[in-house]
Design a protein with these regions (language model features):
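Extracytoplasmic gate region of multi-pass secondary transporters
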Residues: 45-47, 258-318, 378, 382, ...
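Central cavity-lining transmembrane alpha-helices of secondary-active solute carriers
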Residues: 68-83, 307-320
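C-terminal ends and interior cores of transmembrane alpha-helices
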Residues: 99-117, 343-359
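Hydrophobic core of transmembrane alpha-helices in multi-pass small-molecule transporters
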Residues: 104, 117-137, 362-376
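Cytoplasmic helix-loop-helix junction between adjacent transmembrane helices
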Residues: 127-166
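Helix-loop-helix hairpin linking two adjacent transmembrane segments in secondary transporters
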Residues: 162-215
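A late C-terminal transmembrane helix in Major Facilitator Superfamily
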Residues: 317, 386-423
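C-terminal transmembrane helical hairpin of 12-TM major facilitator-type secondary transporters
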Residues: 335-381
């Protein structure tokens, strides 16, 4: 009988000199794929919005409310999803999340097949609301996985890569969804994305495990992660050996929530993320409609043009993470290494206002691309969450951050709908979006001081 020795079972001195595995990058690749589908599902309505409005006679204000349905549910479900993540872990909760949001996306393909137009509008609102609830654990789970699998000096790049999936989704899926809508009808967009997501949920369960439990991880990689600040032990601490309640589940009480909400640094981070997401939700909801209505593009052309700023956003997102981690490796403080890309990138994104002063379609796309590039550079909020979240409450902390950030998904689509409906143009809407970028700069320069991990006080201390 042959004895096989796992790399993790090697003597300590041999394990340290052994070439470390790179399983964390495969986990990051999985996060990227899941987040890409996540954002593709969010963007379905922006691509199919024009034919849906025409089919059911929906006015701009009503469309704004339908756009916001996702975010109403997404925000309300954040704290419960944070508790679930800290109680049961990212692997199981995220798998359930992927399956459910994909099932609800699939159900949207049946809207309008029977009943009145009013019923179809109500059903669309309800299904978007359900998708919002199901997707709520996604980004807090991403942050929890990154905090567990990556050391501090790699965390900015890892967070930027999974966050850049939103732009990659626009690059790949916006033209694809526009083509499906043009060639086969908008119902097919929801049908095929829903089926793809159901399959992905089972793949996630098969591939993703906690660092300490993954059979392909050797001791050298575990030590690299843990000694660099990765919370490899926290990923499994939430599960007791007999299923008893853990520290991760006990922390989800209002006593701890109040501590997080009273922290000046976190308040500034929450405000900044809200304003960043105003730009995000403009691109996710109204941007294709802006290109069709204000710039006279066809739906198919708008779908392809949407991908160009998204490419720039993707490149900016990866560059921002690499720049931040590069500064840390060169001895720059964590605070400056995170703030420099965020402040610089969001200042650059204000060029979106310039679209009000040009007539050329080419210049509009260029300005939007520069704005999206800046937003990508500045989208390091999830790296900041991984840097600052209390070790025993990463899921809860990420959920609070995501809850405040995605309040913009409620406010921005409705506000833009009113601005467009009242004025008949998108000029005021673009100023509104650009000013939110300015508030992000203010928040990180004035409100957020030192960026550091929060230490919670416990009642029995």
């Amino acid at each position: 009988m042959t004895n096989q020795t796992s790399p993790r079972d090697l003597p300590l001195d041999l394990a340290r000199t052994a070439r470390r595995t790179a399983v964390r990058y495969w986990i990051l690749a999985m996060l990227f794929v899941v987040t890409t589908l996540n954002y593709a599902d969010r963007a379905t309505l922006s691509i199919t919005g024009t034919p849906i409005r025409q089919a059911f006679g929906i006015d701009p204000v009503t469309m704004g409310y339908i756009f916001s349905a996702f975010s109403w549910a997404y925000v309300l479900a954040q704290l419960p999803s944070g508790w679930l993540l800290d109680r049961f872990g990212a692997r199981r909760v995220y798998a359930a999340s992927i399956f459910l949001w994909s099932a609800f996306t699939l159900l949207q393909s049946t809207i309008g097949l029977g009943g009145s137009a009013a019923f179809a509008v109500a059903a669309l609102f309800a299904m978007r609301f359900a998708v919002g609830i199901a997707e709520a654990p996604a980004f807090p789970a991403n942050a929890k996985v990154v905090a567990s699998w990556f050391p501090t000096a790699e965390r900015g790049t890892a967070s930027a890569i999974f966050n850049a999936a939103q732009y990659f989704a626009a690059v790949v899926f916006s033209p694809l969804m526009a083509w499906l809508t043009h060639a086969y009808g908008w119902h097919h967009v929801y049908l095929w994305l829903g089926l793809a997501g159901v399959a992905l949920a089972f793949l996630w369960l098969r591939v993703v495990k906690d660092p300490a439990d993954h059979p392909a991880v050797n001791r050298a990689e575990l030590e690299h992660i843990e000694q660099g600040g990765g919370l490899v032990r926290s990923a499994t601490a939430a599960r007791g050996s007999n299923g008893s309640r853990s520290e991760g589940s006990r922390v989800a009480g209002w006593y701890y929530v109040r501590q997080l909400l009273s922290n000046r640094m976190l308040i500034g981070v929450y405000l900044g993320q809200y304003c960043v997401n105003v730009l995000t939700y403009f691109f996710l909801t109204w941007f294709p409609i802006y290109l069709v209505q204000a710039r006279g593009m066809s739906l198919l052309k708008a779908g392809f043009m949407t991908s160009l700023p998204a490419i720039c956003g993707f490149l900016g997102g990866v560059l921002g993470g690499m720049l931040s981690d590069g500064l840390i490796r060169r001895g720059v403080s964590l605070t400056l290494a995170r703030k420099i890309p965020i402040v610089g990138g969001m200042a650059l994104s204000m060029v979106i206002i310039g679209c009000n002063y040009v007539d050329s379609e080419v210049l509009v796309i260029v300005l939007m691309a520069v704005s999206f590039f800046g937003k990508g550079i500045g989208s390091l909020g999830w790296a900041v969450v991984a840097d600052t979240a209390p070790k025993e409450a990463i899921g809860l902390s990420g959920s609070l951050f995501n809850m405040f950030g995605n309040t913009a998904g409620i406010v921005a689509p409705i506000a833009i709908g009113y601005l467009v409906g009242a004025s008949g143009s998108f000029n005021g809407a673009l100023v509104f979006v650009g000013l939110n970028a300015l508030v992000t700069v203010f928040s990180y320069l004035v409100i957020v001081k030192d960026i550091k991990r929060v230490e919670l006080r416990h009642r029995d201390a």
